[in-house]
């Protein structure tokens, strides 16, 4: 990312986290502002506040204050380059997984809702196991997060939605603490999807999730008993996120030409270009983070 890229401007002044780093929930005036941001989403809600995909204004208005508290006060997220996300029209946010719990996706969603003008809803593709749990499945779909099926993703883009994709898949969430800034193999489906729908790809780097949830071991056997792929275990056993400052670095859009029917080696070449861009954003973000902590300014 170019030096000096604009930081996402906070729409509401941040407050210090509560005692012990706990999230402080928004005040009444802030809650009113959050409700207004949901109302300003440019989605085709009907008279009951539900869009054609089942996204519910009521559920978004209940969820956004929780996301805002985590984003602004608990994780104190720093966001850079959000001007690279188009305010309207189809686009794909493609980035790295960071941490064994879906903190990354939640905070990316929060950034587009809280920092963009007008606000946009980033819609993600969730793992199928989530639908084994009725409550989480309901809330996921009512807030725009759907099962990661190609037909769902294509329909969303054809309807000019903002799609959030983590091409590392479930393997990306299984990274241990020592692997937190590495990238595992990317799937290729997202490139074919981008070509078929002529969607720009906005790469992003998510930093800090692996420190917030410092996974030292993944308990696959326990996960099987609980109906999930695995349970990440930390030095304090439970995978509860620590109040570590997180960062999101959005890069300039990537546009590839093609139909999506290209040979595998062509698609793989495009995948590697996206992966290299995300890796570059991670390394640049880490260097800038280190520079701020050291009180030094990075050279160009």
Task: Identify what each model region corresponds to.
Residues 2-59, 154-300:
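Non-catalytic C-terminal accessory region of glycerolipid acyltransferases
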Residues 7, 11-151, 219, 283-300:
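Membrane-anchoring hydrophobic helices of lipid-metabolizing enzymes
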């Amino acid at each position: 990312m170019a030096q000096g890229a604009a930081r996402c401007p906070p729409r509401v002044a941040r407050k210090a986290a509560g005692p012990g780093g706990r999230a402080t929930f928004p005040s009444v005036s802030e809650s009113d502002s959050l409700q207004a941001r949901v109302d300003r989403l440019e989605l085709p809600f009907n008279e009951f506040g539900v869009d054609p995909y089942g996204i519910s204004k009521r559920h978004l208005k209940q969820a956004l204050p929780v996301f805002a508290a985590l984003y602004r006060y608990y994780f104190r997220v720093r966001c850079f380059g959000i001007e690279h996300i188009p305010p309207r029209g189809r686009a794909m946010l493609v980035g790295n997984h960071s941490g064994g719990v879906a903190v990354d996706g939640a905070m990316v969603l929060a950034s587009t809702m809280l920092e963009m003008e007008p606000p946009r809803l980033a819609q993600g593709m969730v793992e199928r196991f989530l639908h084994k749990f009725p409550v989480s499945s309901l809330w996921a779909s009512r807030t725009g997060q759907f099962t990661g099926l190609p037909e769902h993703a294509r329909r969303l883009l054809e309807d000019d939605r903002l799609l959030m994709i983590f091409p590392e898949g479930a393997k990306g969430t299984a990274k241990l603490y020592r692997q937190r800034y590495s990238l595992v193999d990317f799937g290729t489906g997202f490139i074919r999807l981008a070509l078929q729908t002529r969607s720009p790809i906005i790469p992003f780097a998510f930093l800090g999730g692996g420190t917030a949830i410092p996974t030292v071991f993944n308990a696959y056997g326990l996960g099987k008993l609980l109906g999930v792929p695995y349970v990440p275990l930390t030095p304090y056993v439970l995978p509860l996120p620590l109040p570590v400052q997180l960062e999101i670095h959005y890069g300039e859009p990537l546009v590839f030409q093609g139909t999506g029917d290209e040979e595998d080696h062509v698609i793989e070449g495009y995948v590697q270009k996206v992966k290299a861009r995300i890796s570059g954003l991670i390394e640049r973000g880490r260097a800038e983070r280190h520079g701020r902590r050291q009180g030094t300014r990075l050279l160009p």
